[in-house]
């Protein structure tokens, strides 16, 4: 594979995470405007975003098989057509049913693209380089989470309709579409070259279950928290711009944290530092919820930084529970994390309707505490120390 081809594929991976990050994170910023557009209460409007998350979950789950049937390049190009149709549906329809359908399609497209992006990184890079590349790729999710809420606040403050935010997100996919030209993708399925050594099946162990629960609770807690921060902040009397700045601050420090931890993690035992980070994240989230307005930006900045490496560390630890990294095991943990994404508004919507945004934030805090317990319990059963090689550190 040529170096320019590898660079193109790596950028497709980066942008695939940015696309999903933009779609998932911008929800909290535009939810109120979309609720006004359809003349619905915010809590019931949030349920329609479950279609976006369901699309992401279904596509990540199915793409494990779909990648072996439909070439990756074809999937990405077809995804661009679907993206254009979905954004057009948002722009030209006043039907809630069509809005939900468009959200589902956006979820499908971003889920397929993100699973292709993850696969490309694991194919292109080995050992320690793979781990740092995955962290760097994941940082594009956060980068989009920093940029697009600012774009949304800029557009909404100028009374520009909310659907133009999704048109801007569509530009990320346009870049992916352009990159597919003159680019060779790895072959899969029948066309792939199989290694001569047979793969020995290994038992996963209970540690994988702890990690799967941690992945689900972490993503559900994180998105449940960040999706309702704008509404919570507005309820405290903050302006839309200030509320948007809190979300952007979180993802900015999350992004810097990922870059920092891609160097820091190699000097520590992964399970131990993961437990410390999960505990700190739970404490910092509690301080944000109970703190004063003046301290909120500082707490959310430190929360973003210290929680940035948690999810990627969970996935990395999962891959180290077997001697030979199992794609199905990693996919299982990823799927559990994506279930957390799908459940975000299913869980938090009724809580907000009944008790307000602060109750949703406290629920998210409780989920972070569960992540800490799971990571602590993992220390007694994890196999990563016996399976990790010098190349992994």
Curated annotation (Swiss-Prot):
Transmembrane stretches, start-end: 11-31, 51-71, 78-98, 101-121, 134-154, 162-182, 206-226, 245-265, 273-293, 298-318, 332-352, 361-381
Alphabetic keyword roster: Cell inner membrane, Cell membrane, Membrane, Transmembrane, Transmembrane helix
Pfam families: MFS_1 (PF07690)
Localization per record: Cell inner membrane
Entry's Gene Ontology molecular function annotations: transmembrane transporter activity
Coiled coil: none
GO cellular component: plasma membrane
Side Periplasmic, residues: 32-50, 99-100, 155-161, 227-244, 294-297, 353-360
Topological domains annotated Cytoplasmic: 1-10, 72-77, 122-133, 183-205, 266-272, 319-331, 382-393
Topology in the lipid bilayer: Multi-pass membrane protein
Similarity annotation: Belongs to the major facilitator superfamily. TsgA family.
PANTHER family assigned: L-FUCOSE-PROTON SYMPORTER, PROTEIN TSGA
Designated name of the protein: Protein TsgA
């Amino acid at each position: 594979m040529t170096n320019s081809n590898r660079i193109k594929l790596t950028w497709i991976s980066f942008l695939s995470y940015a696309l999903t990050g933009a779609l998932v994170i911008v929800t909290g910023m535009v939810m109120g405007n979309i609720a006004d557009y359809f003349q619905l209460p915010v809590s019931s409007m949030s349920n329609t975003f479950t279609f976006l998350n369901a699309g992401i979950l279904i596509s990540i789950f199915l793409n494990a098989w779909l990648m072996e049937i439909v070439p990756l390049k074809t999937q990405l190009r077809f995804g661009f057509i679907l993206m254009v149709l979905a954004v057009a549906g948002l722009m030209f329809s006043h039907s809630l049913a069509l809005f939900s359908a468009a959200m589902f399609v956006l979820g499908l497209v971003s889920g397929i693209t993100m699973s292709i992006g993850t696969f490309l990184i694991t194919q292109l890079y080995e050992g320690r380089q793979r781990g740092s590349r995955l962290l760097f790729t994941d940082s594009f999710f956060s980068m989009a989470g920093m940029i697009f809420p600012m774009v949304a606040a800029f557009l909404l403050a100028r009374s520009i309709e909310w659907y133009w935010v999704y048109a801007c997100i569509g530009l990320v996919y346009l870049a992916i579409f352009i990159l597919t030209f003159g680019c060779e993708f790895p072959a899969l399925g029948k066309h792939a070259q199989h290694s001569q050594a047979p793969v020995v099946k290994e038992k996963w162990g209970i540690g994988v279950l702890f990690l799967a629960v941690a992945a689900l609770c972490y993503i559900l807690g994180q998105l449940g928290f960040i999706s309702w921060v704008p509404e919570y902040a507005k309820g405290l009397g903050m302006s839309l711009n200030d509320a948007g700045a809190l979300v952007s601050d979180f993802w900015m420090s999350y992004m810097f944290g990922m870059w920092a931890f891609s160097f820091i993690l190699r000097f520590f035992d992964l399970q131990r530092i993961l437990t410390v980070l999960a505990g700190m994240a739970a404490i910092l989230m509690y301080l944000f919820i109970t703190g004063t307005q003046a301290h909120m930006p500082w707490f959310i900045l430190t929360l973003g930084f210290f929680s940035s490496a948690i999810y990627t560390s969970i996935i990395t630890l999962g891959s180290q529970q077997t001697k030979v990294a199992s794609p199905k095991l990693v996919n299982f943990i990823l799927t559990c994390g994506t279930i957390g994404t799908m459940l975000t508004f299913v869980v938090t919507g009724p809580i907000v309707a009944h008790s307000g945004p602060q109750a949703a934030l406290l629920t998210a805090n409780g989920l972070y505490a569960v992540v800490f317990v799971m990571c602590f319990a993992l220390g007694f059963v994890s196999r990563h120390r016996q399976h990790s090689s010098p190349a992994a550190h």
